[in-house]
Amino acid sequence: MRLPAFLRPRTAKQLAGQAGEDQALIYLQQQGLQLLERNFRCKGGEIDLLMQDGKALVFVEVRMRSEKKFGGAAASIGTAKQKRLIIAAQIYLQRYSMPPPCRFDVIAFDDKEMTWLKNAIEA
């Protein structure tokens, strides 16, 4: 019998991803954004961080790569991943009768170097 996800030991990759999300969250809060929700999961996909930036709702994808091979962390967000992020955002926005202005940002870590890309995904 398979253990539920919350009881399974986390892999080194999962722990590194969690640490990256923690670092991204701290950085964004230092820039004045407020955390609304973390790891929003739905049938359509997952959004790492949901932040408020003034009146804008910001969907944040955090990506990590140990090297810049093949274009680095930001380039690893392919068309399929972008579509899943947009679907998850649409599901999240169903909570609002009048959805706020939104944008998709990416926090990319390439060998521990962090880059914040605002409006990285067009929707």
Curated annotation (Swiss-Prot):
It holds the Pfam family UPF0102. InterPro entries: Restrct_endonuc-II-like, tRNA_endonuc-like_dom_sf, UPF0102_YraN-like. GO terms for molecular function: nucleic acid binding. It comes from the Bacteria. Belongs to the UPF0102 family. This is UPF0102 protein mma_0204. It comes from Janthinobacterium sp. (strain Marseille).
